[in-house]
């Protein structure tokens, strides 16, 4: 069953009528609803085009958080072969919010790091709603070190509202873990491609997104804080999240114009949740192209390019 966002009501109403007509035709074969269903399907497509061609930043935030949007595990199943996840940080514990391991990508050995939110109550609790603890970032560091040692390109898929802010996480060095992970991303002498597939929240996202090439899906978001968090800090009113989202420049178009990301991956009509297979395939093509472009570069050049990219970003924004 499709989950509709509040601004998708016209689409919901039309698709609801289509479902009713199909049910009616099933119950009474003498009734021909083919033509009416065809007309309604055309209207659905027109409604989707009309709505999704002018999404505001807050609506894009809602799409980025859509519960049926493909998550890391969906990309991993399709994009990677022989994915072997590694567990634990060898210091304290395992954190399922970050999935990391070794795999093959179109025949090429790679290291993979991603944030997983989960898709139902049980899995969301297991993955801590995609908010990593220090152990997750230290696990990512393990994978980055391994990739650097064996010359494996790194692919990271970002989807988090932010790092977990709990007391225990702070006591175990959350800030240090994020900083070390970011430092490691900047230091490896292998290609590093990052894609924001949903939410890219604050340091919790950038800790695995400091890549040579950084991309965003068309309806994903990337920001220093969530719109609700920004509204709470700026105006002491989280209900002004829509206003905050507009002012924060969090959309893929905004960040491309600012030079924060290198490219935007188009989503299917109506968002990635309406056609996960096509957006996953498109993401794979972009990653493959980026890796091919970087293949001739030396490890030293890759590292220097990455560092200069982010230093320039800090100077120019």
UniProtKB/Swiss-Prot annotation:
Residues 40-293 form the CoA carboxyltransferase C-terminal domain. Its EC number is 2.1.3.15. One of its GO terms (molecular function) is acetyl-CoA carboxylase activity. InterPro entries: Acetyl_CoA_COase_a_su (IPR001095), ClpP/crotonase-like_dom_sf (IPR029045), COA_CT_C (IPR011763). Keywords: ATP-binding, Cytoplasm, Fatty acid biosynthesis, Fatty acid metabolism, Lipid biosynthesis, Lipid metabolism, Nucleotide-binding, Transferase. It catalyses: N(6)-carboxybiotinyl-L-lysyl-[protein] + acetyl-CoA = N(6)-biotinyl-L-lysyl-[protein] + malonyl-CoA. Its main location: cytoplasm. GO terms for cellular component: acetyl-CoA carboxylase complex. Component of the acetyl coenzyme A carboxylase (ACC) complex. First, biotin carboxylase catalyzes the carboxylation of biotin on its carrier protein (BCCP) and then the CO(2) group is transferred by the carboxyltransferase to acetyl-CoA to form malonyl-CoA. Belongs to the AccA family. This is Acetyl-coenzyme A carboxylase carboxyl transferase subunit alpha.
